[in-house]
């Protein structure tokens, strides 16, 4: 998926001010098809990618690197095995997340999906009216969240920062035992060198992200850096890529980080929440 998005971004940048009709004609397809390719919604063959890049005046060595991306973009990602519980609009996020070298997230109501225990995930999935109630789909949804955690715990893990609203510590998902296990797991994950988890306390008052959750993903394709802001809503998501949108969400996250509790205070807040579980 990240190969598709990287190729899409490069082709869009390389086209510059040339008309989409002119570029599409070079490769022998419609403006609509080119538009889908440049948005990362469709893939093209390595041959078509070469034709476009030659027309754009891209150097030969760069052409070959990005033509290889066109081939890679056609290969299924590991997440496709969970497709029974993977909406099309979420597939792009999982693909980019799996290739990201830095992940920043704000979550106001729940523990972020990538940090959830299996039982906590299951309790949420079983309440999600968008996920079919068949056990296979429920298990796929839970397994997908667990598999995503390898991005934080496997080889070459991503740098991860999370700001979690204090209210998420008190929303009892799945009952007392599941809730306690989740909070204890949050403490454990917070000890990893590549993870920084901060709680935004109630006492911090007004903050910069009152509109809701978001995720910032930083990734690299063929030595070129990209960023993506992800904002989810019921039944879909927004994928924001412009410099202005990335800058805005980065500033919002930095403000939240500044307002959040320190590492020691965060640990204390989580332990307090554990003690209050009845």
What are these regions (language model features)?
Residues 2-13, 20-25, 39, 43-170, ...:
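Interdomain hinge/linker segments and adjacent boundary elements that couple functional modules
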């Amino acid at each position: 998926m990240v190969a598709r998005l990287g190729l899409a971004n490069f082709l869009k940048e390389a086209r510059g001010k040339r008309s989409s009709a002119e570029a599409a004609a070079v490769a022998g397809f419609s403006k609509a098809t080119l538009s889908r390719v440049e948005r990362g919604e469709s893939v093209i063959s390595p041959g078509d990618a070469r034709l476009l890049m030659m027309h754009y005046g891209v150097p030969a060595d760069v052409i070959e690197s990005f033509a290889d991306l066109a081939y890679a973009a056609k290969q299924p990602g590991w997440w496709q095995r969970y497709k029974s519980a993977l909406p099309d609009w979420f597939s792009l996020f999982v693909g980019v997340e799996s290739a990201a070298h830095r992940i920043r997230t704000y979550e106001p109501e729940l523990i972020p999906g990538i940090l959830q225990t299996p039982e906590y995930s299951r309790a949420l999935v079983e309440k999600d009216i968008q996920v079919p109630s068949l056990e296979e789909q429920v298990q796929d949804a839970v397994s997908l969240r667990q598999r995503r955690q390898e991005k934080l715990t496997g080889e070459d893990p991503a740098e991860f920062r999370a700001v979690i609203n204090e209210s998420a510590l008190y929303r009892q998902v799945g009952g007392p035992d599941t809730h306690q296990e989740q909070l204890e797991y949050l403490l454990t994950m917070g000890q990893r060198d590549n993870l920084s988890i901060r709680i935004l306390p109630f006492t911090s008052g007004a903050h910069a992200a009152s509109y809701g959750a978001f995720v910032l993903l930083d990734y690299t394709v063929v030595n070129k850096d990209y960023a993506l802001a992800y904002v989810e809503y019921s039944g879909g998501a927004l994928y924001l890529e412009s410099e202005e949108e990335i800058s805005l969400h980065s500033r919002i996250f930095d403000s939240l980080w500044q307002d959040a509790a320190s590492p020691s205070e965060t640990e204390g807040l989580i332990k307090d929440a554990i003690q209050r579980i009845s």
